[in-house]
Amino acid sequence: MATSTMSVCSSAYSDSWQVDACPESCCEPPCCATSCCAPAPCLTLVCTPVSCVSSPCCQAACEPSPCQSGCTSSCTPSCCQQSSCQPACCTSSPCQQACCVPVCCKPVCCVPVCCKPVCCKPICCVPVCSGASSSCCQQSSRQPACCTTSCCRPSSSVSLLCRPVCRSTCCVPIPSCCAPASTCQPSCCRPASCVSLLCRPTCSRLSSACCGLSSGQKSSC
């Protein structure tokens, strides 16, 4: 498919057919000239637009590096949904912000080596935590409401879901953190409860009233 053979290609400026030394696939790099890329052959896995002649994105997508700036700047969402802006874009080079927008970069192409918080939004792919990056552990739908960035230790970075490992600062008596019991007092929230991803409070033995109201707690707590 990559070899150059004598193929039948239609002219972009006439309805006549001519024999030209074009690769079998119209949208391979040597064949992206306007005289070779006709509307019909361009409906391939690489060139998604109807016509390579009228689409500057298709021209750039035919180059060895699919997600160059020339492609992403002129690319429409319909052009980037197929393979031209997928894994090669996010794996061969670090994810660029113009590349990893939700319409272009699918979760399959956001690998840990390329996913940086600045380029891979949660809708595109889940960020991969790094010890020096606290922006990964910001509030999101995947994290408990009571866990802030100060709860995220580097040890939580092993999870692709970026689930934070809570520190004692996480278990402050926040209503959404301290179980359903509305009468839960600060004495109910001990640092030991922070081993839970949900930051549910561990009842203090001195606060039997709170122990009785907190769901999921043992009555002998």
Curated annotation (Swiss-Prot):
Pfam family for this entry, one: Keratin_B2_2
Tissue expression pattern: Restricted to a narrow region of the hair fiber cuticle, lying approximately 20 cell layers above the apex of the dermal papilla of the hair root; not detected in any other tissues.
Any Gene Ontology CC annotation: keratin filament
Region (18 X 5 AA repeats of C-C-X(3)): 26-214
Keyword set, alphabetical order: Keratin, Repeat
InterPro entries referenced in this protein's UniProt entry, alphabetically: KAP
Sequence repeats: 26-30, 31-35, 36-40, 57-61, 79-83, 89-93, 99-103, 104-108, 109-113, 114-118, 119-123, 124-128, 136-140, 146-150, 151-155, 177-181, 188-192, 210-214
Function comment: In the hair cortex, hair keratin intermediate filaments are embedded in an interfilamentous matrix, consisting of hair keratin-associated proteins (KRTAP), which are essential for the formation of a rigid and resistant hair shaft through their extensive disulfide bond cross-linking with abundant cysteine residues of hair keratins. The matrix proteins include the high-sulfur and high-glycine-tyrosine keratins.
Subunit structure: Interacts with hair keratins.
Family named by the database record: Belongs to the KRTAP type 10 family.
Designated name of the protein: Keratin-associated protein 10-3
